[in-house]
Amino acid sequence: MNLSAPPARRPIFALGLLATALAASFSANAQTSSVRGGVTSLEEIRVLPSAKEAVKQAPGVSTITAKDIEKRPPANDLSELIRTMPGVNLTGNSPSGSYGNSRQIDLRGMGPENTLILIDGKPVSSRDSIRMGRDGERNTRGDSNWVPVNAIERIEVLRGPAASRYGSGAAGGVVNIITKAPTDTFSGSVTAYGLIPEDSNYGSTRRTGFNLSGPIADKLSFRVYGNIAKTDADKPALNSQASGMEVNETTVPPAGREGVRNKDINGLVRLDINRDHRLELEGSFSRQGNIYAGERLFSRSTSTIASLAEEGAETNIMYRRAGSLSHYGDYGQGRTSRLTFAYEGTTNSRLNEGLAGSVEGSISNPGAGSVSELRSLNISGEYNTPLQIADKHVLMTVGFEHRDQSLDDDYATRSGQSINNNTDSKSKARTTAAFVEGNIELTEALTVTPGVRFDHHSKFGDNWSPSLNASYFITDNITLKGGIARAFKAPNLYQSNPNYLYQTRGNGCPYDPVTGQRVSGPCYIFGNDNLSPERSINKEIGLAYDNAGWAAGLTYFQNDYSNKIVADMGDQTIPDAVYIGGSLVRPFQWVNSGKAVIRGLEGNLTIPILGENGDTLSLSNNLTYMITNKSKETNQPLTVIPRYTLNSTLDWRVNDRLSMLATATLYGKQKPRSHNLSNNSEVKGDGLRERGSYAIFGLSGAYQVTKSTNIRLGVNNLFDKRLYREDSGSGQGANTYNEPGRQYYATLTASF
């Protein structure tokens, strides 16, 4: 049933937003008056952190600083570093293993589609321009590679209840990439990075980036950064031995990691109107082009695939254009505001990948391509004001967000067939939201942060996302923290478009669970505009200790996940054949599935060994342990992730100029699915093979050559532990990706 609000309700919702804004304005005025209605004058109020800042102290929040990035520079994609945080894995969006080397950021096992990527608080959605296949996967690198390493101030990773204020797509969590701000004095830096693998079958990386900022005139300053990078593709023969497939004119083994060429430029101008108000105007352009390595959805190879892989052809190009205008206000005594208008446009140009049968996800014609266009408009704002209610200190936040998103993908609807005889290639969605949250100091030891967000979606109606986080100081050094929140994700523009179609003549049709026989084709799988949003109740509770360089913590988390959107391939029902476009076919659709549960533990331990608070030598560890991650309906995993992940870092500052870093990451066993949801069949043989536990070690050192010049040399995968991909289809089990062998890297930064 379509839950969109009737026209009569829309003015009511608009009035609700207006009332919220007026309430914020009233509270701002009331704070300068005398005691009235339980609200005392602002002069008596002690300003607390905002709710947004308070939840960053929750157990499920981690921060990667610019210094951390310098110590462990990623080769190209930020996901390489973000994966070292607790609760973070790199995986696909389903247990299928499709496009296994294009892994994305997965927070607490909820899948990449439930990880919201932000740049300076603004949503990034370029991956949404890429077609979603029936197994729930996209052939994409994700959205973690639009900002060059040298431009980052810090990265905030919010997992669980702390992320609920961000709305749709943040059920797993949020990754917020914060860039460097303009400086008061003219300054800049240039960074060059190179990575060379010991085995030439693996791709190498070169990148150069710059960062420049300073004043233009009185009250006017700027910041600009740019980046050029290239990571070569793995050789087509890399997985030959593991898969038993040789490279020839018509055959290529399961693909290794594809390469990528990056070009990024970003500029920001800041106008300080006065001491309390400023405007920021920002614009950016990025180009990402792949270097093809032979990737396809199934194991079938063709002469076209083999030729493109051998050539290292550029088979898809992503162009991203973004711009924003923001106002920041400080009205004194803790009252602040922000208003942002942001635009993002993505052009996805690629060689056509099959939409039918065994050629689904495979390139068959190197001369045939298509373009999809995704445009997003985001308007958001918030107002923070301190209050004192019933003798309690409160920092109240009210805010709103409006998102408009439109997608035009002619190729995905090119079959000319649809359930409703409408083959429009365009789809749109609009979301309007308001939220209110407060940081309340109930006692000197107990702080609670309640909040609620209301979203109205143009297709799927209303959604409420209440949340409650709390922090209690048992002692000055021991804190008990917890939270609970309701999160959601609206169907994406492919899942909800009834004109989006995958078709198969018969071999891709599902098996009937009653007869055990494959359903006779052809079969069509359509988008569905009658879906419900995915929902999750996220809970966590943790204990933390922090004293004189020692830090320890243990957190239990649980996500009760429901309504996950999947392509119904006979698991729920086998539809009767109907006539569509003059042909008798079986119409399947995207549907909401049943309940799932994710439970796990996150822990951390930092040990100061030498120096004050360990500033000379320290050992830092974090652990993620997955207790369960499965559908209650099918008993299948939601994603293929390690049972546990342990990250350890030994950080030694030898002297003022020299420092050393040793790292170790241990991954637990990974189990594959036992049931193939894409055709409703049981997985057998090699498809049930697990990936055993393994460990990766690294070593690096940095030397401050001069005050403005720094060099770092390092070795990744010190003991040369290599993992291979055994198949491109369901026969690979959990062996869905490559772990590259030993690599040597160097990075040089010159600043002024």
Where are these regions (language model features)?
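Short, acidic, small-residue-rich periplasmic hinge/interaction motif at the N-terminus
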Residues: 31-71, 120, 330
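Extracytoplasmic beta-strand/coil segments of soluble accessory domains associated
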Residues: 33, 79-127
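Gram-negative outer-membrane beta-barrel transporters
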Residues: 35, 191, 441-443, 552-561, ...
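N-terminal periplasmic accessory domains that precede
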Residues: 78-81, 103-106, 118-120, 142-145, ...
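Short acidic/polar hinge/loop motifs at secondary-structure boundaries
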Residues: 123-159
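C-terminal beta-signal and adjacent terminal beta-strands/loops
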Residues: 127-130, 562, 567, 666-678, ...
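Transmembrane beta-barrel wall of Gram-negative outer-membrane proteins
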Residues: 201-293, 319-324, 390
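Outer-membrane beta-barrel signature, preferentially recognizing the C-terminal barrel domain
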Residues: 304-327, 427-429, 479, 483-561, ...
